[in-house]
Amino acid sequence: MELYNLTAHELKTKIDNKEVKVEEVVQSYLNRIEKVDSKVGAFLYTGSEEAIKKAKELDNKISKGESLKALGGIPVSIKDNISVKGMQNTCASKMLEGYKSPYDAHVIEKIKNEDGIILGKVNMDEFAMGSSTENSAYKKTRNPWDLDRVPGGSSGGSAAAVAAMETPLALGTDTGGSVRQPAAFCGLVGLKPTYGRTSRYGAIAFGSTLDQVGMLSKDVEDCALLTKNIAGLDHRDFTTADIKVPDYTQFLKKDLKGKKIGIPRECFGEGLDESVRKAINEALQVLKENGAEIEEFSLPSLDYALAAYYIISSAEASSNLARFDGIRYGHRTKDYTDAVDIYFKSRDEGFGKEAKRRIMLGTYVLSEGYYDAYYKKALKVRNLIKKEYENVFKRYHAIISPTSPTPAFKIGEKINDILAMYLIDAYTVPVSVAGLPAMSIPCGMVDGLPIGLQIIGNYYKEDDIFNIAYSYEQSTEWHKMKPQL
């Protein structure tokens, strides 16, 4: 079997047992990228030389009898909005074309400290704004299950790279579903941790009260391994929590006896594809058989979550992206007459259509006369959603819903239908608005396309999510399915 077919924990075992060299593992993935990425389009930059150099260093350590750390020799690919020292960090935007990061993000420091190997930077929707990775200024990324379909977004490059077996692990960012939805579309495990569980230091901001670094992997154990080793307090991000990070691999048990799971009626109404509904219902039956108690409940505020999310996230984006003006940061136009002209033309040339749309919306809702009517009201809705979830979690260990109302859609199908594109995130957005942790795991196939099951946990209770996800995974075969490229 080719090394790229293996999971991260299988590779780690082989490396630790000296069955394979780290350089062989890295080379296997570099060869795979060379073979299939012209079809998939996941990578914006491959750090081949750096990766091979690091692999040789680790092999040298092993030859001296030293043990590697928790991520020893495992390649990880990084969404192109997370800073890796010396590598490009473009946010898939012309605004940051040619920019190389002078420092490592906190999560990258942790990967490097645990002997992980950074393989390269992967494609995304510009500034993480989108649900299909069609908003990249550089290339289209395709779904490895069907090259005519989107991989999801905004972390579509991360998901496509793992699904195409170009990398065993990938980091993305999740603001409103940008890790979970691509995981669902590409048949992967994707986790958005609790807001504050992972540091945002070094991740270029979109919506500062929503953004969270997330993980994509082939199975639940790989996700637990990566999460355990990148989560935790960082004094450079004051929103990170000083709460001990457990060893999530200890919660990978099949038995769900005593676990209570709630099913929100609002997530099973109009707009849900019947094939997705069927797959979710079958998954719930599996969890019941494994000992979980399951009951329906109502979460009325979910109907307002999408509107609140787009107001809050766009407001924060308009503020965060104001710095890219051609004067201090970002692309500067070559054709200008004065300073004001530089602002207008640089931003017009540097930002794509969706980024401009959200900046304009955000500026509008923050402007005098509209602040109270929109932004302030959205914050009130956010508090209402949080309170409803807090009450629900007094009764349940977890909540389950579909990750997305449909499987992956065709490239170009929704790009001009903004409402349809935004509705794709209807089930992931409320979780982000509340700051809760959630994971998408594969739970079925329809017409050759994967379907995702979303497991939502209480604040800092990722352990419950891992337990339920692992229980389902061990009772099914969906995580073993691989696309034919």
Curated annotation (Swiss-Prot):
PROSITE patterns: AMIDASES. InterPro entries: Amidase, Amidase_CS, Amidase_dom, AS_sf, GatA. Keywords: ATP-binding, Ligase, Nucleotide-binding, Protein biosynthesis. It catalyses: L-glutamyl-tRNA(Gln) + L-glutamine + ATP + H2O = L-glutaminyl-tRNA(Gln) + L-glutamate + ADP + phosphate + H(+). Its EC number is 6.3.5.7. One of its GO terms (cellular component) is glutamyl-tRNA(Gln) amidotransferase complex. GO terms for biological process: translation. Transmembrane segments: none annotated. It holds the Pfam family Amidase. Allows the formation of correctly charged Gln-tRNA(Gln) through the transamidation of misacylated Glu-tRNA(Gln) in organisms which lack glutaminyl-tRNA synthetase. The reaction takes place in the presence of glutamine and ATP through an activated gamma-phospho-Glu-tRNA(Gln). Belongs to the amidase family. GatA subfamily. Heterotrimer of A, B and C subunits. This is Glutamyl-tRNA(Gln) amidotransferase subunit A. It comes from Clostridium tetani (strain Massachusetts / E88). The lineage of its organism: Bacteria, Bacillati, Bacillota, Clostridia, Eubacteriales.
